[in-house]
Structures are given as structure tokens and as C-alpha cells.
Regions:
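Domain-level signal for soluble alpha/beta catalytic cores
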Residues: 1-187
Length: 187
């Protein structure tokens, strides 16, 4: 979980110390840096942050990215992945902001990999890469956790092939959409 989400889901009872979500997110960033120092010292070389609430209020994504970059800058040599989704609790999308609406945030991110939903969006996720010349890897959600069956290989291929316009095969990781933890166990 990233500093933006932590701030947005917290009840701030100390507005004298943290007058707004930005100040609170910066305070969380300091705590995250200290915690990450411990895991990096133990050998961790790959860290993923989740920031699903960026799609709930896209205007906050840029300051969220700036604070995330402050954390990342403390760990040269560590690879960072950022997961952004639509808040898929209970197999339903909770937030509807488009990735292209957050282009200013994407353009300043200092990440190695981006993890985005791809197959269940109401728009084309790949449009972001027309504006953002991202050179890292992509984890693309090509398995829809909202259906009660198994997708065909043809459907997964249909979701996957457009990625090749922007990424070489060695920079593509296929994954499920966010929210798989809410799929009933019998499925």
C-alpha cells in the first residue's frame, strides 16, 4: 500500500500536525522508508506499491506520484512496481478514473514496472502509452476476476496482443485483474 492510499483511508485526528492528505501522506512516506530499509537490508530487491485510490480522485495522482518518488529515491538498485486499479472490492469496480486522466502523474513516476488493469476497463488502457513513453515493464491484467468461469486462450490472447504495440515480449507480464481475493472459493 502506498502513502496516498494510507492517507486517504486514515481518520486524521491530528489536523494540527497533518492539515491535509498531502501532509499525512508525507508522514506515512517517512514511516514506509524506515520499514523498507529493513527489508532491503535483508535482501529485498523488488517492491510493489498499490495506489488504487488514484482512480477515485485523479487530481490527487500527481502529488501521490511525487511522494512515491521521494520513497523510491531512497533505494537505488531496488526495482519498484506500481499497481493502479479501480478498487475492485467484492468483484465490482469502485473507482472510474481513466489512466489518461492521470498522465501528469505517470510521466513523473520513477518506477521499473507498472501493473494496470486491462481486460475489464470501460476504455482502452493502452491509450496511456500514446502519451507516456514508459521504458519499463508492464504487468497487464488479462484475466477477468469478475466472471465465474475460465476464460478461453483466445480471449486471453485477444487481451494480450495489443500490448505488443508498446512493449517487447520480455517486458510483458500477464496477470489477473485486481480483486481476485474476492472470488468465491468454489470457483
Amino acid at each position: 500500500t502506498g502513502p496516498h492510499m494510507l492517507a486517504r483511508f486514515s481518520v486524521n485526528e491530528r489536523t494540527d500536525l497533518y492539515p491535509d492528505d498531502i501532509a499525512l501522506a508525507k508522514a506515512y512516506a517517512k514511516v514506509l522508508i524506515e520499514e523498507l530499509k529493513q527489508v532491503v537490508n535483508e535482501g529485498c530487491t523488488y517492491i510493489q506499491f498499490d495506489e488504487p485510490v488514484w482512480t477515485e480522485n485523479v487530481k490527487e495522482a500527481k502529488w501521490g506520484a511525487e511522494i512515491l518518488n521521494e520513497i523510491i529515491s531512497q533505494f537505488p538498485g531496488v526495482k519498484f512496481n506500481l499497481h493502479i486499479c479501480g478498487g475492485n472490492a467484492h468483484r465490482k469496480r469502485g473507482y472510474f478514473g481513466r489512466y489518461t486522466d492521470m498522465i501528469d502523474a505517470f510521466k513523473i513516476l520513477n518506477i521499473d514496472e507498472i501493473h494496470l488493469e486491462h481486460c475489464s476497463l470501460h476504455y482502452t488502457m493502452l491509450d496511456i502509452f500514446k502519451e507516456w513513453n514508459f521504458q519499463g515493464s508492464i504487468s497487464a491484467g488479462v484475466i477477468d476476476q469478475r466472471i465465474d468461469g475460465t476464460e478461453t486462450i483466445e480471449k486471453v490472447v485477444k487481451h494480450t496482443e495489443p500490448l505488443l504495440e508498446y512493449f517487447t515480449p520480455n517486458k510483458i507480464l500477464l496477470t489477473s485483474e485486481c480483486g481476485f481475493g474476492h472470488v468465491p472459493i468454489e470457483i
